[in-house]
Amino acid sequence: MRDTNSSKYSVTDLTEPRLIKKLYELILKEKELGKHGWLRNVDKNKNLSTKEFKDIWSEWWKGPLPPSTEVDIILIFEDPMEVIDKALIGSIETEYFSRGDLNKKNFYVGLQQVLAFSIFGFDGLSLWHVFSPEIEENVIENYTTTVSELISGFKLPIFYLAVKIQNKEDFRLKCFEPAKLEYYIDWLNNYWTVETNRNPPLQRNEIRNRRNLLKTILKVPV
């Protein structure tokens, strides 16, 4: 997916659930076209606290599971580095900003959710902020610069992507953070391939056990 891409979908009256569905469909379509060589699977709206999740955990491991959470988009890549094994499992939290949301949502919204994903054993963590067409670019730059400073200041291993939907007639995106970025999924994969950008809690055995459970639920065979 790149910032000049377009879709047949209109973004009139776009809501966050619809945005997630559109992004999922675009990524899946590009995967089917062979545009992302290391991408093996895409999932969306995955609840990590279902009965199936809890039952498998209680059967194989001890200790409580974290509270309920849902991941907007999950990307599963083949990991050429094999840092843990052949799979690289990434989580994406997506937040949509309409003009009305600017007075309701904090600039850092979604960051706490991404950090929560880390304790479930994801290899990669990512936050996407998507801004509606009517929001001025100086406002977007103020939001994204502040979030980037927060992430870099604390050296959080989170890939932050901020884009604006160009217009309401097609799904065309302009990237603000990282600047002039194209081919988002490939950049995401490259970022997560670097071992120091991986999820730090994976050094703990308990988190790796949760990752094994995650692989089972997502049907990752490697």
Task: Report the location of each language-model feature.
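Secondary-structure boundary elements
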Residues: K29, L33-G34, P80-E82, D123
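Non-catalytic C-terminal interaction segments of nucleic acid-processing enzymes
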Residues: T145-V222
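Short, charged/polar micro-motifs that form catalytic or ligand-binding hotspots
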Residues: Y9, D13, G63, G100-F107
